[in-house]
Amino acid sequence: MIEYRLNGPASQERQRIRLMAALRENRFPQSILIDGPAGIGKKALAIEVAKALQCSDPNMRPCGHCFGCKMAVDRGVTDNWVIPMESKEAHAKSSDDVSAGSTAKTVEDFKQAYIEEIFKNPYRIDVFSAGAEISVGLIRSMTSAFALKGDRVRVVIVAEADRMNDSASNAFLKTLEDVPPNTYFILTTSSREKMLQTIRSRCLALHLLPLSDDEVRSETLRMLGEDADADEVTDDAVGLSVGSPGKALYYVGAGKKWCELAASFVKGSLLADYYDLFTQLSEAELDEAAEANRFLEVVSFLISDLMRAKSGAKLRIPATTALVNIDAFPRVDVAALERALETVQETMSRVASRRTAPPMLLLSLSIKLFEGCK
């Protein structure tokens, strides 16, 4: 019997055991959906499974050396991936349609650049822009390539599958209804509720769990490289990650900016110091919905930590929470913080709806956040 070994964090071992059993017993489904929070390793697991499915070693898979394993990790084989792309990138000419000697970037060029970034670090949460989507053209390009595959096993990873637009979703659903032989689809998503239920129902569901704090710290240090200082991965970066090495890596680089701004925002609202607060918000340039909500996620986390401070619980972002000095505001109790948290979450929903400019919503939030507690 062929044995299978899928590498990954200990916190996700149960999910890998489930997949390895299906592989070993030759009952692996032709489509699986890996879901879980952003940056916890869904693409990393998808790559491991792709290698295992394409490996030809008679004893242990994936071996990492055979033709199938090499094809699974070949950055130049763009047909192995369906990924979100900007509209101008997705509508670029195909390499089959450009003249010889042309220097114009093709859709394959754009796609390969994204794939290379994924392979460099599959935990990253900022590979694709907020406006990128999976268009119907990308799905049709995938299906048209099926005729060229021959008899070999083919694995297609659909990264961030929730970004399929309506036309792409319907086209992909038709593909799932009649999957070609020896073809497997591995979908990843952080928002499975945004996907068509009919697509979800045709996939084996696999939910990945967040990593432990120790695993996050270890994996983040590994991603930073051999020269990284352990102090770079702060307690606040690990706390904000909520079990996601990808988020921890992001906050190692951008955490200081977001945490200081969030602390100033909350403290400025508590002090009703709106002039300085408005100036800081203006300088932060939070005009895009994605950026505004990323900031509000940190604000939300900070307010939750202030509630922990009030109740004596362990803090998740101690350095940032200390900047607010909540003990200096005795009138702000846990109930007031709960109301503030609800107000932040309501604002995040309004930002996501894109009906009102984010800067206006943030200014309004700063005034309402602790109304009646001054």
Features from the language model and the residues they span:
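Clamp-loader machinery-focused feature within the broader ASCE/P-loop NTPase space
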Residues: 1-167
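Charged, glycine-rich active-site and insertion segments that engage polyanionic ligands
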Residues: 1-52, 60, 67, 181-184, ...
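Residues immediately C-terminal
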Residues: 163-164, 178, 194
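Structural recognition of the conserved hydrophobic beta-strand(s) that form the central parallel beta-sheet
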Residues: 155-159, 172, 183-189
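Conserved catalytic/switch belt of AAA+ P-loop NTPases
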Residues: 144-147, 170-184
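Short secondary-structure boundary/capping segments
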Residues: 70-72, 177, 197
